[in-house]
Amino acid sequence: MFLLYGGLFFLLLSRFVFIQFTGTAEGQELSTKAENKYSREQILQANRGKIIDRNGEVIAEDTLSYKMIAVLSPSATNNSSLQRHVSDSAKTAKILSKYIDMTEQEIQNLLDKNIKAEKYQVEFGKAGRDISNQQMEEIKSNKLPGIIFIEDLKRLYPNGQFASHLIGFALKEEKEDGEAVAVGKMGLEYIYDEELTGSPGKVEFKSDTKGFLLPNAEKMVTEAQDGLDIYLTLDKTIQNFLEDAMNNAQEKYEPERMTAIVANPKTGEILAMSQRPTFEPNTREGLSTNWLNEVTEQTIEPGSTFKIFTLASAIEEGVWAPNATFNSGSYTIYDSTIRDHNVVGWGKISYLEGFQRSSNVSMAYLLNQIGEKTFNEYINLFGFGQKTGIDLPNEATGIIADSGPVERVTTTYGQGTTVTPIQMVQGMTAIANEGKMMQPYIIDKIVNPNTNEVEQNHKKIEKDSPISAETAQHVKEILASTITSEIGTAKKFKLNGYTSAGKTGTAQISKPGGGYYWGRNDFLYSFLGMAPVEDPQLIVYIMVHKPKLELTESGSDTTSDVFNTVMERSLKYLNIEPENLELANPIEMPDVIDGNMLESQSKLEALGLKTVVIGQSDKVEVQYPESSTTTISNSIVFIKGQGDIQLPNFKGWSKRNVMIYKSLSNVPIEIVGEGFVTEQSLTGGSIVTADTPIVVQLATPEEVTNIEAETEELATDLPQD
């Protein structure tokens, strides 16, 4: 027995000596094992980057929430009178099922399974995350032992239904280590997920056996790096104007779909975009199978809004003759007949009237004058059939129908050819921006919130200039006449306090198997417009797909409800001064061609118009605005004859009227600045010729206060020499 105990003692002593000298046991470094046992690491969560509007208003951000945990191990309870672990899984499950998205049985199974496995604690997955403070307090009021909460982050969209298909949403996903991280699932949240995702930090420290920080122990902190903040060109206020108008139209007309865009024509910035149906990003309520951003990813046949670009092509080519006439109603190509929307037409009418009435036949005749090849070149210059380059993925290009003569004609009025809404807006920037077409964009800048450094900064991109500034001005005025003319199709788009210009569209909707639907409620109604006419600040494009119309309603009711509301509210919000149009009386321009110059001048001034005479002959050869078009009292009108040209005093003139004078007189005038004329290089009254260079300086009303701005005529077209 002595030998047995002695042998055991010797073995233990040998083992002790071995461990002491080698520092290992069972092949493991004991110092490392001890280090690991008493080393603790806490993860510091990183905030996902914010999505912010142009004015610093938050669109998407991380906010404080709570994660619920059930402590299961009896070792957590040090005081038997105060339990700190789940002791009654059935009771706990019954109460918790009232607050989280799990059944009573699911909760009890989860608790019992992990109690049996001797787990210290367990989480409740998705159902136990994103707990609000109110929800947490309600659960706490039940005083359930072992149910604790830790702070967590939740993705919040404070504006709710707000450009939802553009912004998208992010959801928590569990990684392999059990940590839940927000991951972008749709929209900008998905597209810029890598930029928005931050890098978590950690705190490392030595602890006692209960996990508490040892006295005088140092903490090693690696700070979390928040994700990058993305600033958009969107304006929260204008976006809300659009959302409200879309909601009202949705409720009133019950269309299958709607899409709308608001843009700055001078920069290409998208200020608002929306579509219906839509969804609530915080709950995903309303999210259907359609995850497409229809502004960029959906193609449509644009209908008569495409006539804007046919008109611009004709004017730029010099073949637009507004007073020339054609027989409306029908146009035959081989064995196909093109008809006007009212089938019978309006007899022999002028091309200007044809455009105001939205005649398809007028477009067919214009194509003959432009030439098919030349027209296709203009379509390409306006950016159709190709991506705009907007900073969003999966952009569609559309298809230009030019397989045969019929298809080429129908393209002139937007049938058969497909485009995207963003292409229409991009093309319209050339009309509103003196011929310069701007690339649309949505991302303003990307900023690192950890360093405040701008990591990406978008600058406006001027693309092709498909037309001249003079042509753009001409188109703009004709578009204005579709609103002010008694025969115009866009009378319902007249704004309170502001002039507007644009074109209506009624497009047939193609069937999946070919052909088109035909019924009162089977059309795509649209409007592409801008305001104010003098210096457009905004472009608005609205499409309404298959609305339910009453017998007293038209397609223009659906689109004008949105356009007028959004445009008027947005212009006021942008501090664009109303034009006080209610004080101006509409006047139909008389025909003074071939009349005596002095008599014509007296006649026009008797109507309340300001007359500018170009040339000193006795006979009027050109007038602007043309006869039968509408202008307003106190507007500047022009009459031209032969002979010497006496330069007027331009002070207070608008840029538009200087451009009209330049076009009529052929005097080489260089226009510098925006707004109204403050200075001119040659004094009024001087005799000038086509070789006399003149510079006029303009300034905006904000830059100069001593100029009385002229009253602008509402709608005419530029003169033809």
Map each language-model feature to its residues.
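Soluble non-cytosolic domains of exported or imported proteins
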Residues: 46, 83-90, 129-133, 182-186, ...
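Extracytoplasmic
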Residues: 44-47, 54, 61-65, 144, ...
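Periplasmic/cell-envelope proteins involved in peptidoglycan metabolism and beta-lactam response
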Residues: 1-282, 373-383, 495, 545, ...
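Beta-lactam-recognizing serine transpeptidase/beta-lactamase-like catalytic domain environment
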Residues: 60, 208-218, 258-303, 312-541
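Acidic/histidine-enriched alpha-helical segments
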Residues: 108-115, 255-267, 328-329, 392-396, ...
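Conserved SxxK-family serine transpeptidase/carboxypeptidase catalytic domain
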Residues: 127-142, 151-165, 169, 448-560, ...
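Ligand-recognition elements built from short beta-strands and adjacent flexible loops
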Residues: 497, 501, 511, 542-721
